[in-house]
From Swiss-Prot:
This is Probable chemoreceptor glutamine deamidase CheD. Probably deamidates glutamine residues to glutamate on methyl-accepting chemotaxis receptors (MCPs), playing an important role in chemotaxis. One of its GO terms (molecular function) is protein-glutamine glutaminase activity. Disulfide bonds: none annotated. The lineage of its organism: Bacteria, Pseudomonadati, Pseudomonadota, Betaproteobacteria, Burkholderiales.
Length: 226
């Protein structure tokens, strides 16, 4: 399937904390580098981001999808909000940029049960299981993963060398509510319409702190993991 041009992230900025040019990836977007030294950043709740790169040529990309799969008979399923389409687009764009399929490596993040609406429908868990199954089917090794739990996550990905920095917001973090509830409302509404479930969105209490984790790429002789 050809990638929709309007799904490619275009929000560029300079991140002073990392002293790096950066691209912000919003839900339903993706970005693939062409060897440039740039950081890709996104915020995840129940959504999942796959970070895939070719370590030999330093080309990589990230997507951000909301739901696992849609009705294959519906035109709406061919949109970036569905993992099946978002993964296909990301991999195809990496290959167009010169990556070799047999060298692709992945790191996957998100799928948290952050909002009550998403907990009710197991969206985060379904997204996480989907991306792992998809990559296994495609034969792409998962070098690191941080899926599930109850945390919102900020992902900072450096495609050139495969590094990923994950900042986890504490459960019931007010800032997480503002970011995640706004960006994932569309996903909850979509699933509600499909399942007739009645989602609840609870408010978060005072922030309690954050935890930052780093996911480097192990050497090919190291065991798979974080």
């Amino acid at each position: 399937m050809p990638a929709r041009l309007d799904a490619r992230a275009t929000r560029r900025y300079f991140d002073s904390a990392f002293n790096s040019p950066a691209v912000k990836i919003l839900p339903n977007e993706y970005y693939v580098t062409n060897g440039e030294d740039v950081m890709l950043s996104t915020v995840l709740g129940s959504c999942v981001a796959a970070c895939i790169h070719d370590p030999v040529i330093g080309v990589g990309g990230m997507n951000h999808f909301m739901l696992p799969e849609g009705d294959i008979h519906s035109p709406a399923s061919a949109t970036m909000r569905y993992g099946a389409f978002a993964m296909e687009v990301l991999i195809n764009e990496l290959l167009k940029a010169g990556a070799v399929r047999e060298r692709l490596e992945a790191k996957v993040f998100g799928g948290g049960a952050v909002l009550s609406a998403m907990q009710l429908m197991n969206i985060g868990e379904r997204n996480g299981q989907f991306v792992l199954n998809y990559l296994k089917t495609e034969g792409i090794p998962v070098r690191a993963q941080d899926l599930g739990d109850v945390h919102a996550r900020r992902i900072n990905y450096f495609p050139r060398d495969g590094r990923v920095m994950v900042r986890k917001m504490a459960p019931h973090h007010q800032k997480a509510e503002a970011l995640i509830a706004q960006r994932e409302a569309a996903a909850a509404q979509t699933v509600q319409a499909e399942t007739r479930a009645a989602p609840r969105v609870e408010r978060f209490a005072r922030p309690g702190g954050m935890r930052v984790e780093r996911f480097d790429t192990p050497s090919r002789r190291d065991p798979v993991g974080a």
